[in-house]
Regions:
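N-terminal strand-loop-strand
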Residues: 1-36, 64, 68
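A generic structural signal for ordered secondary structure
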Residues: 17-19, 69, 90-95, 149
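Active-site donor-binding loop signature of nucleotide-sugar glycosyltransferases
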Residues: 23, 39, 121
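Short histidine-centered catalytic/ligand-binding loop motif
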Residues: 35-43
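Juxtamembrane/interface motifs at transmembrane-helix termini
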Residues: 40, 87, 146-148
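Unchanged
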Residues: 42-65, 75-130
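Structured alpha/beta reader/binder surfaces that contact nucleic acids or chromatin modification marks
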Residues: 72
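Charged phosphate-binding loop/patch that engages nucleotide di/tri-phosphates or the phosphate backbone
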Residues: 130-149
Length: 149
């Protein structure tokens, strides 16, 4: 299994909602749709905080005060049709922007990223209840723990 390190950022708005991106990827068992926080793979030799700041800049076109990591999480999943042994370094940031927009994403990312929007902790819980795939699975609790909700 190929190791992977990624930086994820819980970006909060003034109301305590977190910004999530709806993604669609092809896996060996077919199409997989899910919501997750901003972020991506840490480049070789890159520090996690540097990667988190880069991902926010690339995906939102913003320079935010990114803090952390506030926690790390280990998981395994299929990425680009290959199983990955992943460690997420999770950070927090605050954003005053009303309407989130994806900027600076690559053509490959555009094909994968379908939608971006703010979610309250209650909306995250309701999404889970409807059967939506939202990562991390304990996002609502993490939102409340780190300043949202």
């Amino acid at each position: 299994m190929k190791p992977r390190r990624s930086a994820r950022v819980m970006v909060f708005d003034p109301a305590g909602r977190v910004l999530l991106i709806r993604c669609v990827v092809m896996r060996s068992d077919g199409e997989f749709r899910f919501w997750l926080t901003l972020g991506g793979e840490i480049e070789p030799g890159e520090e996690p905080l540097t990667a988190a700041r880069r991902e926010v800049r690339e995906e939102l076109g913003l320079q935010l005060d990114v803090r952390g990591p506030v926690y790390t999480e280990h998981n395994q999943f299929e990425h680009l049709r290959e199983m990955r042994d992943n460690t997420d370094f999770v950070f927090v940031a605050r954003c005053a922007a009303d309407a989130p927009m994806m900027r600076g994403v690559t053509t490959d990312e555009i094909s994968m990223m379908q939608e971006i929007r703010w979610w309250s902790a209650e909306e995250v819980e309701a999404g889970f209840a409807r059967g939506e795939r939202i990562f991390p699975v304990d996002l609502a609790a993490r939102m409340r723990e780190f300043g949202g909700g």
